[in-house]
């Protein structure tokens, strides 16, 4: 049986987990947006020490006498140095917060890409096993049909073979739907139109790793909350 729904294999390009993460960090729109915000906040720091622009007002007419004359008013507001210093400190802290937001988005993006990548790989391997079982039950069904025709078996054996193969076909169809959804999510995270799929043999079971206090305190979320 051929299950419908899976993308054409010849249109897919294999990619490693690390390459997928690197691509996402460069292309992802949410991360790009956070970086632009951080760059904008960095530019604003310079404005904290800028003096207000000088205002010049010119007037012409009978101002001080019956004769026509001119009058110019020059206005310049200058605050105490501490005002500019405080403004710059506030802008600098806002920039630091925006940089932590960038780091936070990057950490979350890496997590999402890794999850989708390895789930994608797991389902691909599951599909391979189901296809192998489909072939086995296909042979079993052919033999059951032949045995039924020559009277060597009853209808139960034939029906059982048909049911088993039908269940596998249903599982394959559902699995292909899941693969299509993961493919779309993968493309969205990496922000690419290329049909990228996990490289064959790049699957690894996740394992629990020791978590030390230092690594926890360096997490962007913790740093952002500590500000």
Identify the function of each model-found stretch.
Residues 108-224:
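Periplasmic alpha-helical coiled-coil/stalk elements that build and connect Gram-negative outer-membrane
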Residues 15-19, 69, 139:
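Generic alpha-helical secondary structure signal
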Residues 2-10:
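C-terminal segment of classical bacterial N-terminal signal peptides
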Residues 9-55, 78, 86, 152-156, ...:
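Bacterial Sec-pathway N-terminal export signals of envelope proteins
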Residues 30-36, 49, 79-109, 131, ...:
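Sec/SRP-type N-terminal targeting helices
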Residues 54-105, 221-227:
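Small/polar-residue-enriched beta-strand and adjacent coil segments characteristic
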